[in-house]
């Protein structure tokens, strides 16, 4: 049963100090309050709390759109076979992540490679995640893993079944260049194709080079900063400067390459092509703060404004994948993160903390207007806790385990 089945109360979010919009073109907002009705943002600024059933006073803290992990290795259920961890998605919500996008359920034990098997896996994952929402999280799962046996008819059928994601890089191809027919077939059916980029990630896979990416022209260059092994510098420059490919940067990649990609993207005005993800759970581990840590790194080590970097992990991804949530905008779902500088940080507010590389403290996470976390069990304590009227106990699972 969906975790979002019960409508959220009419909620006013007040005393906002800084508003991040998730819009790469205008990453800061001016509203000091928000009104949420039926899980959606219906008013920005000037909110009268009289009719609100719940008031969340953020005490001058920052309100931002929920983060979207654009590279999260889900399989089925809130469990990762790769790291044998239960409940990781529920924990990721405490890292500000309100949506994740699957790059293919490749960690399924005994994953099939035949056409009927990979189609069945994509459909069952899509169906499962359509109604399974750990702690309210929206999981965009069911990505078809491209194999040489798949035909155009297969992709057209998959599209009728609601499959809208595909991953290239783990199929049984002798040469990745041979995947061109499947990439084009998926795209022609309206399925978004993410391609592995860089060196081989696991035994049995193979490197995807710049030549492959320029030939295949996927919709998204997955972990273009390495997953975890990066492409060479000159290749990265070509992909940024001479193509319109989406540039996905991940925590489990090469930080040096990520910094180079950001610098080039800023130089050529390609900010709208950058999105962020964690590329976890993988051998790198399970990282509830993976996206937030990536934001802190890029906001402190590049010339990108922290609000723009946050937008790369929210609204920019929503634009690429045509997601409803991801921006603080009228009519959008109220997927929100309330955060401030962590207690003891020398940064001023969440933006100041990020600018010096500190992970902000999260004091509330809302998904579709419903409070899913108050005191985050994963971030440092926020310098400014929220106050909820009437009083609301911390949702189950919020406790720190000492």
Residue ranges and their predicted role:
Residues 12, 66-68, 193-194, 276:
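Residue-level marker for buried hydrophobic side chains located in beta-strands
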Residues 333-387:
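C-terminal cap of metal-dependent C-N hydrolases
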């Amino acid at each position: 049963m969906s975790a979002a089945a019960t409508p959220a109360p009419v909620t006013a979010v007040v005393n906002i100090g800084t508003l991040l919009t998730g819009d790469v073109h205008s990453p800061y907002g001016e509203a000091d309050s928000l009104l949420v009705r039926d899980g959606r943002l219906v008013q920005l600024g000037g909110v009268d709390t009289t009719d609100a059933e719940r008031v969340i006073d953020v005490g001058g803290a920052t309100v931002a759109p929920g983060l979207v992990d654009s590279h999260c290795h889900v399989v089925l259920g809130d469990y990762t076979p790769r790291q044998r961890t239960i409940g990781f998605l529920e924990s990721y919500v405490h890292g500000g992540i309100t949506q994740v996008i699957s790059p293919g359920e490749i960690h399924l034990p005994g994953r099939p490679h035949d056409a009927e098997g990979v189609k069945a896996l994509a459909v069952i994952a899509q169906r499962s995640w359509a109604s399974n929402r750990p702690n309210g999280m929206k999981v965009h799962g069911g990505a078809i893993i491209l194999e040489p046996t798949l035909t155009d008819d297969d992709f057209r059928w998959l599209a009728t079944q609601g499959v809208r994601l595909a991953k290239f890089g783990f199929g049984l191809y002798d040469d990745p260049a041979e995947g061109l027919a499947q990439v084009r077939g998926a795209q022609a059916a309206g399925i978004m194709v993410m391609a592995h980029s860089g060196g081989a990630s696991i035994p049995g896979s193979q490197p995807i080079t710049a030549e492959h990416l320029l030939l295949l022209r996927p919709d998204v260059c997955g972990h273009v900063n390495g997953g975890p092994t990066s492409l060479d510098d000159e290749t990265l420059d070509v992909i940024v400067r001479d193509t319109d490919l989406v540039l996905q940067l991940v925590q489990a990649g090469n930080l040096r390459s990520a910094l180079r990609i950001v610098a080039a993207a800023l130089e050529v005005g390609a900010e709208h092509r950058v999105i962020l993800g964690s590329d976890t759970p993988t051998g790198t581990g399970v990282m509830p703060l993976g996206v937030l840590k990536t934001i802190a790194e890029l906001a402190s080590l590049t010339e990108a404004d922290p609000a723009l970097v946050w937008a790369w992990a929210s609204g920019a991804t929503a634009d690429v994948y045509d997601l409803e949530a991801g921006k603080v905008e009228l009519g959008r779902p109220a997927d929100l993160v309330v955060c401030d500088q962590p207690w003891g940080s020398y940064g001023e507010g969440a933006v100041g903390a990020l600018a010096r590389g500190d992970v902000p403290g999260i004091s509330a996470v809302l998904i579709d207007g419903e409070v899913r976390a108050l005191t985050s069990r994963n971030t440092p304590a926020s310098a400014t806790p929220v106050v909820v009227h009437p009083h609301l106990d911390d949702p189950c699972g919020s406790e720190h385990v000492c």
